[in-house]
Amino acid sequence: MSSRFSSAPYDAYAALSTADIKHPTITLSTGPAVALTYGQYRAILATNRNQSDRAAAFAAYHELFAANVNTYASLYNGVLQRDWFHAQSRGYRSTLEAALHGNNIPTTVVENLIESTKAGTEPLRRYHRLRKRVLGLDTYHNYDGAIPIVDLDRKYSL
């Protein structure tokens, strides 16, 4: 019975972020107006070489979530409260300990992973600087990460 209620935050999130979403329309620099579905959003980020088009798609798509930020925050709080309740009722010291127990992973593994990740971000930053330079961008943003560095349209035949 508990699991049925435990899925309520996820079910509400899924309905809000898919079925109830009103996709915005943006106008690209080439002229056409595009209904910004998730598929169109990903396609623009991955194929459109115009940074201002990618920026417009990014802003419009994320505004969908910003419009309901309090609802999303409340749903996430429900997930956190549910997980905390389950961890406490089963005798765990934390939700992390509860999540890792089934695979017999000590919490120190995740804590070390987090610290190692924080300490090892320089290669990723160097990669982003390289992408910025190769793409000829003045600034580099999250929405620039999916665009290919080179144009390659190779056809293969069998």
PLM segments and residue spans:
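Long, non-coiled-coil amphipathic alpha-helical linker/lever segments
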Residues: E111-Y127, Y143-D144
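A conserved glycine-rich
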Residues: P106, R125-L158
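His/Asp/Glu-rich acidic catalytic environments and adjacent acidic regulatory segments
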Residues: M1-T108, S116
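Generic macromolecular interface patches on structured domains
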Residues: A19, T71, G78, P123, ...
